[in-house]
Regions:
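Ser/Thr/Asn(+Pro)-rich, low-complexity disordered segments
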Residues: 1, 6-291
Length: 291
């Protein structure tokens, strides 16, 4: 059937990615983000959490043909090296989020891992479209609980609305990466990374973590702003009421998490399918066996 054919094609693609080659050199503790035929590794950008690249390490560790060592989950993704600390500190421009293990309290939520104030919400969406955060706990935290805290921090920051932006509140929240009036940028709950631009995907793709707050945002966006925000493919990518701007784009990068995460909230469908794969189960067990 077409479904079986798709399953086999996806499996084949994942199994034949030479994940270990993206270490750049044999003893590297990291995977690297970019390579090109003419520039090779010149960008030299390491994959380090906290961001959207957890799933890259997970798929690489799970890979049966070209897999990487499960220890790279901690040496790479969860690295505590100075380089990794500098990368994390740059998100919030503060020191309290530079370690993978955070431990600070923001808006009443104690954040076990993550950057200061949790960062943009795509951090808790992209890696968890298939990976069920309820069922993944490493030696630091359970990722459903941690992700839920990040969503709550984001909403409470928007309710406080330090910048005085038009529209922000309990039903208009969810700072994340999106199109905006002057370019494309990752908005986050920090004053230096917040310019009043709101992307519907932020709150709507957080449905599994904050169903009531996400539903409030959905109703607000559709009922009160639908005349300019809703179109043939759903919600437009972003809007900024302070400068009277709405994106002309329907961006698949932000539409997909909304569709998938709402379905995961409703039925666990994508989570159940991904987590049922034997190699996924083995990979998670490998990571969890490291103490």
């Amino acid at each position: 059937s077409d479904v079986c054919s798709s399953d086999l094609s996806i499996d084949s693609l994942w199994k034949n990615v030479e994940w270990s080659w993206y270490k750049q050199f044999k003893d590297s503790p990291y995977l690297y983000w970019h390579w090109s035929p003419d520039q090779a590794w010149v960008i030299n950008h390491k994959l380090i959490g906290w961001n959207e690249t957890m799933i890259t390490y997970m798929l690489a560790i799970m890979g049966p043909k070209y897999g990487i060592s499960p220890e790279m989950y901690y040496s790479g993704w969860a690295s505590q090296e100075e380089y990794a600390q500098e990368y994390r500190a740059d998100w919030g421009r503060v020191e309290d989020g530079k370690m993978y293990t955070n431990g600070n309290t923001y808006y009443g939520e104690n954040l076990k891992v993550g950057v200061s104030n949790g960062g943009p919400l795509f951090f808790i969406h992209y890696s968890y479209l298939g990976l069920d955060p309820h069922k993944f706990t490493d030696k630091y935290t359970n990722y459903f609980e941690n992700n839920q805290k990040m969503a709550k921090i984001n909403q409470r920051y928007c309710i406080e609305n330090q910048g005085g932006y038009v529209g922000y509140g309990e039903d208009c929240w969810g700072l994340t990466a999106s199109d905006f009036a002057w370019n494309y940028q990752a908005q986050e709950p920090m004053p230096h990374r917040d310019n009043g631009t709101m992307a519907p995907t932020g709150a709507l793709a957080s449905f599994p973590y904050t169903p009531d707050a996400s539903m409030k945002a959905l109703r607000n966006y559709y009922r009160n702003h639908g005349s300019f925000l809703w179109g043939e493919y759903g919600f437009r990518d972003a809007f900024n009421l302070t400068v009277n701007w709405v994106s002309p784009l329907f961006m698949g990068l932000n539409q997909a998490p909304v569709t998938v995460m709402i379905e995961n909230y409703r039925t666990n469908l994508l989570w159940n399918l991904f987590m049922s794969h034997p190699d996924v189960q083995k990979g998670i067990q490998k990571i969890q066996s490291i103490k």
